[in-house]
Amino acid sequence: MSEISVESVAVEGSTVEYVVDYSRDLRRFFDTSTFSVSYDVDVSDVPRGVLTVPVLAQVCPVAWATDSTVTVDTVDRAFVEGLAAVRETLERMYPVVFDGGGLDAERVVDYDHALGEFDGAAQLFSGGVDSLATYVRHREVDPALIAIQGWVVGVDETERWKRAMGHVEQFAARTDSPTHGITANISSFLDHTMLNVH
């Protein structure tokens, strides 16, 4: 069976960098072996099993579609349980595509998810129709609006990102919502064209 392995997780302040190794037959689905995420807060005290969540969220669907195994040293139990629901949904939507693969973690850890500095709800927010509809459905919980650079707006498109984040902040000012920006090389980590034709 093919394998995708999270080899390392390195944290420096607000940035997490992951090195991912994969079987030769899976190379066509990856543009690089390094996945990185930068937050607008320091994440150096976040437990390792929680830090693995962003990279696993990227590679697990690839594993399911290619009947591969993802290996990782540590992962958060709450994420693993939520991931099962994501997989079930994808299998119902695409039964021919998602029919194998899995996650093999050395340790699945129950972390204390006690509320800390942030004690509210959050939602991904681009300012598009879907994110506006999500906000309208959940506005009573006053979600923080999280925008991600690296999917629609590339990580190197600084001016375009400033404009996009400006629109998010304008909306947030009208609704008195907090905002957060995340930068991740989502669109340059995986080869989405190859995944779409798989």
For each feature predicted by the language model, list its residue ranges.
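Gly/Ser/Thr-rich loops at beta-strand to alpha-helix junctions
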Residues: 77, 129-131
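Short, glycine-rich nucleotide/cofactor-binding loops
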Residues: 122-129
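RNA-binding accessory domains that recognize and position tRNA/RNA substrates
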Residues: 1-119, 137-183
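Flexible loop/turn segments at secondary-structure boundaries
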Residues: 131, 152-155, 187-190
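Conserved adenosine/adenylate-binding substructure
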Residues: 181-198
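Hydrophobic positions on the alpha1 helix immediately C-terminal to the Walker A/P-loop
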Residues: 134
